């Protein structure tokens, strides 16, 4: 695991374990937590090893959605308990398959990639920065874009988590400041509604 991704996994592991204990104690079921990773696989090179797309970018942009609805749960074939590394790899797999530098695939087999958040929101931002900023003013510069979410939890379906779950997340899994410190994005963009609390960031 590469440097930044390892730092993220080390950040998530103890916090997720503590949050999971709280959720289990209350009988609350959630989907997989949304954990970032920036080591991608390109051209079937064998594993998620390339962080250079992010670290070498001249402009690093982190784009926030509200919450990851229908974020899948990684499956363990051998019965070993799922760890934060597995959740990070889940993100890296999605990104490796769907993020193409200047755009997200809109015709991917992954249902999340067909979401308007990517096809219109995220792709629109990338296109605007490329067409009106980089191509015109800084043609020799390269941008990289990273998807994040204000809330890291989902219960599946089309609805967000309850107030109780948000409060537990804020208390035990408040990781966005550390994510920003580790990844050092130059720009933060929020594609969220006005009802989202500022306490998460």
Language-model segments: what does each one mean?
Residues 190:
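Redox-cofactor binding/interface segments in oxidoreductases and associated redox assembly factors
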Residues 199-201:
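Conserved small/polar residues in nucleotide/adenosyl-binding loops
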Residues 2-183, 187:
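A polyanion-binding, active-site-adjacent surface
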Residues 193:
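Flexible loop residues that form catalytic
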């Amino acid at each position: 695991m590469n440097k930044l991704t390892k730092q993220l996994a080390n950040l998530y592991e103890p916090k997720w374990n503590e949050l999971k204990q709280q959720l289990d104690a209350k009988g609350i079921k959630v989907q997989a937590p949304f954990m970032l990773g920036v080591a991608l696989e390109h051209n079937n090179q064998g594993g998620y090893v390339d962080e250079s797309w992010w670290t070498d970018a001249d402009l690093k942009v982190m784009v926030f959605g509200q919450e990851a609805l229908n974020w899948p749960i990684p499956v363990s074939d051998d019965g070993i308990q799922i760890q934060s590394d597995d959740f990070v790899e889940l993100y890296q797999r999605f990104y490796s398959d769907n993020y193409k530098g200047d755009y997200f695939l809109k015709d991917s087999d992954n249902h999340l990639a067909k979401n308007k958040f990517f096809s219109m929101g995220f792709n629109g931002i990338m296109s605007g920065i490329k067409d009106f900023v980089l191509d015109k003013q800084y043609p020799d510069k390269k941008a990289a874009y990273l998807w994040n979410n204000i809330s890291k939890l989902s219960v599946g379906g089309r609805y967000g988590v309850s107030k109780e779950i948000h409060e537990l997340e804020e208390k035990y899994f408040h990781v966005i400041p550390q994510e920003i410190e580790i990844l050092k994005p130059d720009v933060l963009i929020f594609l969220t509604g006005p009802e989202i609390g500022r306490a998460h960031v």
